[in-house]
């Protein structure tokens, strides 16, 4: 205590007081929380010691900073924590006086609180007293969650049963004397976000019995219509009566409406504060790719894989999501999932002219069965392959299909791309990473946009995108030409992309001359049928493709129904009304497809 100078008392509670102090050497302000032990019950004493031990172990950028702690003369537990100049959220709501917070600010606060709770829940810690007066604001209006006096450490499958907390923020299962878990904190957080949004408590009554009745029935007033439907629905999902139907903190962080704010937090957070893994730097989080106007430029890409799980989401800027298109996956703190964000400049497609030629070097990613960093192997320094793009309309969209595939396997276009094989590329053979120049619409199960779904051609095994060349060096090297044409429809705009790959086999070696002859025959047959290949699209007369499309539609509809997203389900099924598509015809061709498949 000799190291600190007491400035003033800033708070007082039933079990102690809070003092504003200044460190004599650092000249920095802190908060001294003194919890009285004398004339207290054993439970209160245990709670004070537990808070001291717990706050000393947690480390998260959105939880109050721990500085020091000690027991003073056996009568007080003293805890030194970081000082938040912005006060607590309850004071901020009172100062608002009818002037609502912006949705952007509320979403940022919600993401920070969810990350704090996700960190606690991943470490089996229940806060049990999440309320606006325990949410503090820093000078730059960032969130700090504090007051762990009622926190409880659970075992892996344990539940809490003690009725503790603030009545207005208690969940229905706690009031019903039912054992509760981490979803109780989600309910309390939902009450806080509701209060921050509506500037009034979610549940308020004149007596305790009426309050309990409102909470158990989960009766809340409508939120202000100035906020988007997605944001209001997100708050309502946190206030569902059944804890099984409430999303967890990790699931809420993956909600499409919060993705821009999650990305901002990842970029701003320090690696030392447990949001970004220590082996990654914030600079590596987002890689922008732009092409200069010169006709020749060299692009060097580098990709790392931290496990055998790959989560890729293509997103496109929209009025509601004003941020750079990114490929991202969100780190789940309870597991060892990797965080990989790749940002693609939107101007990439527009800057590539119809006759611009550029060279690329790509790397092959070795997939390992365990969650260990995989090796990145780059190809030797050779003459890089040349790729030319002809732009027919204002945009280009390229798709990629695996080279090695079985005869009957047809991948649905909406599924994620498979990982590259662990095969090391040979000299003279180069693969082109089209994903690095790809601009794709935002189409996902969690955020359906029917008008943005592109029609991807379902390539078959006899239509490989690149022709592998295995040839022994001959006295007079002959370049092989492989022409690949694919036609893709996106936003009512026809795009034809021509891939011309020239492989100079000066250093390449083959095992026999048969490989070279087969490659030449395949190239000639490809050139002969290029006209018909250019026009390939989704074949509406194909029973198998239509059956797969309908299967995907039904799966999509079932998932929307299960998540109670009825508005999006209505948009999805609207084209299949009585005046739109005949259910009878649909049943006929579906039955035919089943019969043919059975044969």
Swiss-Prot record:
Give the top-level enzyme category.
Answer: transferase
UniProt xrefs under Pfam families: Pkinase
User: Could you name the active-site residues?
Assistant: 129 (proton acceptor)
User: Could you tell me what this protein is called?
Assistant: Serine/threonine-protein kinase Nek1
Protein's organism? Oryza sativa subsp. japonica (Rice)
Q: Which family does it belong to?
A: Belongs to the protein kinase superfamily. NEK Ser/Thr protein kinase family. NIMA subfamily.
GO MF assignments: ATP binding; protein serine kinase activity; protein serine/threonine kinase activity
Catalytic activity annotation: L-seryl-[protein] + ATP = O-phospho-L-seryl-[protein] + ADP + H(+); L-threonyl-[protein] + ATP = O-phospho-L-threonyl-[protein] + ADP + H(+)
Known InterPro entries for this protein? Kinase-like_dom_sf, NEK_Ser/Thr_kinase, Prot_kinase_dom, Protein_kinase_ATP_BS, Ser/Thr_kinase_AS
Return the EC number: 2.7.11.1
Superkingdom of the source species: Eukaryota
């Amino acid at each position: 205590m000799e190291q600190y100078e007491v400035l003033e008392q800033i708070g007082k509670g039933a079990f102690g007081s809070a003092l504003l102090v200044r460190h004599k050497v650092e000249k920095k302000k802190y908060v001294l929380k003194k919890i009285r032990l004398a004339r207290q019950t054993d439970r209160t004493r245990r709670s004070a010691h537990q808070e001291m031990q717990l706050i000393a172990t947690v480390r998260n950028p959105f939880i109050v900073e721990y500085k020091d702690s000690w027991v003073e003369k056996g009568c007080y537990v003293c805890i030194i924590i970081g000082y938040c100049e912005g006060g607590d959220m309850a004071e901020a709501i009172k100062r608002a006086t009818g002037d609502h917070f912006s949705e952007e600010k509320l979403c940022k606060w919600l993401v920070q609180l969810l990350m704090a709770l996700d960190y606690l829940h991943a470490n089996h810690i229940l806060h049990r007293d999440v309320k606006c007066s325990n949410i503090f604001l820093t000078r730059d209006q960032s969130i700090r969650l504090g007051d762990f006096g009622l926190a409880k450490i659970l075992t892996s499958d344990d539940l809490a049963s003690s009725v503790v907390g603030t009545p207005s923020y208690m969940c229905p299962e706690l009031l019903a004397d039912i054992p509760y878990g981490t979803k109780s904190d989600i309910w309390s957080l939902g009450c806080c976000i509701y209060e921050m949004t509506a500037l009034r408590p979610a549940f308020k009554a004149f007596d305790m019995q009426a309050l309990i009745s409102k909470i158990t029935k989960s009766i809340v007033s409508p939120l202000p219509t100035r906020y988007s439907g997605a944001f209001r629905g997100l708050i309502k999902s946190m206030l569902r009566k059944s804890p099984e139907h409430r999303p967890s903190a990790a699931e809420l962080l993956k909600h499409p409406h919060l993705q821009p704010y999650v990305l901002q937090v990842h970029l701003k957070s320090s690696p030392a504060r447990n949001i970004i893994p220590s082996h990654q730097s914030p600079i590596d989080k987002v890689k922008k790719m732009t092409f200069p106007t010169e006709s020749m430029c060299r692009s060097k890409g580098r990709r790392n894989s931290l496990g055998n799980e790959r989560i890729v989401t293509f997103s496109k800027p929209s009025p509601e999501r004003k941020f750079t298109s990114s490929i991202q996956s969100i780190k789940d703190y309870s597991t060892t999932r990797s965080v990989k964000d790749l940002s693609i400049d939107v101007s990439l497609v527009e800057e590539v002219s119809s006759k611009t030629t550029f060279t690329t070097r790509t790397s092959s990613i070795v997939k390992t069965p365990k969650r260990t960093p995989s090796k990145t192997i780059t190809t030797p320094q050779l003459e890089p392959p040349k790729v030319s793009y002809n732009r027919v309309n204002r945009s280009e969209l390229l798709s990629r299909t695996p080279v090695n595939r079985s005869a009957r396997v047809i991948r649905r276009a909406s599924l994620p791309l498979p990982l590259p094989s662990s095969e090391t590329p040979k000299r003279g053979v180069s693969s082109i990473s089209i994903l690095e120049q790809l601009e794709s619409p935002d189409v996902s199960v969690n955020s359906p946009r029917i008008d943005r779904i592109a029609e991807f051609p379902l390539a078959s095994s006899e239509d490989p995108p690149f022709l592998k060349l295995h040839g022994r060096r001959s006295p007079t090297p002959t370049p092989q030409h492989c022409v690949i044409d694919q036609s893709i429809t996106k936003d009512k705009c026809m795009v034809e992309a021509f891939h011309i790959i020239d492989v100079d086999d000066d250093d390449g070696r083959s095992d026999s001359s048969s490989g070279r002859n087969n490659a030449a025959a395949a190239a000639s047959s490809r050139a002969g049928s290029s006209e018909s290949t250019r026009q390939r699209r989704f074949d509406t007369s194909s029973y198998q493709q239509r059956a797969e499309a309908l299967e995907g539609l039904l799966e999509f509809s079932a998932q929307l129904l299960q998540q109670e997203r009825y508005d999006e389900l209505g948009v999805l099924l609207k084209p299949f009304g009585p005046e739109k598509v005949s259910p009878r015809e649909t049943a006929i061709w579906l039955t035919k497809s089943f019969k043919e498949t059975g044969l």
